[in-house]
Structures are given as C-alpha cells and as structure tokens.
C-alpha cells in the first residue's frame, strides 16, 4: 500500500509541475515578444541582423529547456501510472512460485 501511495503522490506532483511548466512556457513566449517589441521601439524599426538572431536564440534556448523538463515530468508521470496499473493485474498468489505451480498441477489432476 505504501508504494501505491508514493505513486499517487508522484502522479499528482508531476501533473502540477507539468501545468506550472506550461505556464512558464507561455510567459517565456510573452517575454520574447516583449524583447522584440522593445527593440522595435528603441530603433524605430523591426530588429534585424545579429540582434534579432541573438534574441531568437535566447528565447529558443529557454523554450527548449522548458520543453525538455516538461517531457521528463510527463514521462515520469506515465511511468508511475504504468507501474500502478501493472501492479493491479500482475499480483501473484501468496507463497513461492513453486507452491503456486503445485496448486495448478493438483487442480489439473483433480479435473481428470
């Protein structure tokens, strides 16, 4: 039961972090647009050349980091869910593996 409880906590935390990271991603996009607008206001024209490229690269790096972390969190959440599901379906009867095989053999002998 303790493991199931831990998996539930991991699932909830991963969901919350995923939501938080998507909000951060939106904020980064807005910041990138603000930086572009700021450059337009300072120069009176759209940024071009090296400054525009550097701004795009900085924004892309931030976005890439957020996406990587978000992907990691979602994969961790999915892993926890899969473990949770497989535990319910693959439970073995009490006793050792040999004992469970003996029970099956005895049942088969009794059927004939």
From Swiss-Prot:
GO terms for cellular component: extracellular region. Glycans are attached at residue 84. Keywords: Glycoprotein, Secreted, Signal. Residues 1-29 form the signal peptide. It comes from the Eukaryota. Residues 94-112 have a biased composition (Basic and acidic residues). It is found in: Secreted. Residues 84-112 are annotated as: Disordered. This is Putative uncharacterized protein encoded by LINC00305. It comes from Homo sapiens.
């Amino acid at each position: 039961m303790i493991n199931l409880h831990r998996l539930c906590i991991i699932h909830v935390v991963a969901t919350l972090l995923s939501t938080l990271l998507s909000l951060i991603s939106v904020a980064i996009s807005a910041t990138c647009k603000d930086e572009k607008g700021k450059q337009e206001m300072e120069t009176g024209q759209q940024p071009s050349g090296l400054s525009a490229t550097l701004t795009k690269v900085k924004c892309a790096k931030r976005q890439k980091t957020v996406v990587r972390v978000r992907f990691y969190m979602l994969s961790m959440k999915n892993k926890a869910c899969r473990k949770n599901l497989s535990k319910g379906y693959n439970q073995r009867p009490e006793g050792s593996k040999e004992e469970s095989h003996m029970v099956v053999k005895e049942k088969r002998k009794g059927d004939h």
